[in-house]
């Protein structure tokens, strides 16, 4: 009998709308797969990037966030608008480390939309089955995937600072959010503020395991030797790494 992959999903559901919609789906006996484990949150805006990244690093094949429709948040802070921004940023981070961003999904479900909840969960699970297990579907080995998630998780406080200072916006429609976060300006900010930090974080994690030469780091991270040298020189100036003359390798400072 052929093995059929069943994705593991972690869902963060807004207490007031999506969670109530899920409850209605159950009471109404709408049929949908039971692959998702649910965490109820008071607002989708309270879902921290660290929660999402931790879920993936712990082996979840997909993460689902469900909230109120835009303009219908139960709080004056309009947390679902913030959730929309966080989702865009997390999708960019996943893409940056080689993970398919479609493994993360945000949907709006009201308390009266039990049938919609069943439909979006069924569709999400179908999509994840097509993508395959986390890592395997992307062609990333287990150790490489672990390294990438550890590196990006270590940057979460910095990423949240970047979001607050440079990427925090408030729009009325989804199209406006999509246009902003898919713009060349935001892509440029990501390259300038996050890409280098992530590469340095990966290098530091590797050096904690064992001393490595520039060539070895280049091969492991699939970076050019010149890029690795630039990152190592920058890290050395900050007192993070040093060159060991005896071993002829770089080690943590």
Question: Where in this protein do the model-derived segments appear?
Answer:
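A short, conserved structural fragment
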Residues: 236-247
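Minor-groove-contacting beta-hairpin "wing" of winged helix-turn-helix DNA-binding domains
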Residues: 247-253
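Iron-sulfur-associated redox domains of electron-transfer enzymes in respiratory
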Residues: 1-233
């Amino acid at each position: 009998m052929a093995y059929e992959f069943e994705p593991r999903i972690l869902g963060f559901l807004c207490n007031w709308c999506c969670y109530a919609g899920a409850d209605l789906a159950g009471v109404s006996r709408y049929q949908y797969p039971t692959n998702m484990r649910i965490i109820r949150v008071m607002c989708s805006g309270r879902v921290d990037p660290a929660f999402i990244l931790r879920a993936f690093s712990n082996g979840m094949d997909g993460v689902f966030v469900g909230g109120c429709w835009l303009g219908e948040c139960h709080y004056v802070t309009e947390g679902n608008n913030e959730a929309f921004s966080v989702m865009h940023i997390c999708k960019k981070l996943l893409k940056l480390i080689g993970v398919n961003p479609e493994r993360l999904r945000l949907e709006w479900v009201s308390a009266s939309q039990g049938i919609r909840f069943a439909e979006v969960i069924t569709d999400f699970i179908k999509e994840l089955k097509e993508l395959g297990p986390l890592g395997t579907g992307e062609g990333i080995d287990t150790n490489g995937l672990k390294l990438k998630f550890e590196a990006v998780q270590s940057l979460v406080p910095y990423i949240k600072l970047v979001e607050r200072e440079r990427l925090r916006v408030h729009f009325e429609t989804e199209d406006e959010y999509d246009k902003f976060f898919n713009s060349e300006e935001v892509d440029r900010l990501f390259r300038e503020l996050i890409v280098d930090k992530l590469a340095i974080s990966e290098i530091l994690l590797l050096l904690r395991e064992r001393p490595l030469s520039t060539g070895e780091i280049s091969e492991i991270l699939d970076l050019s030797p010149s890029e690795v040298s630039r990152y190592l020189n920058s890290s050395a100036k900050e007192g993070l790494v040093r060159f060991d003359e005896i071993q002829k390798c770089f080690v943590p400072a």
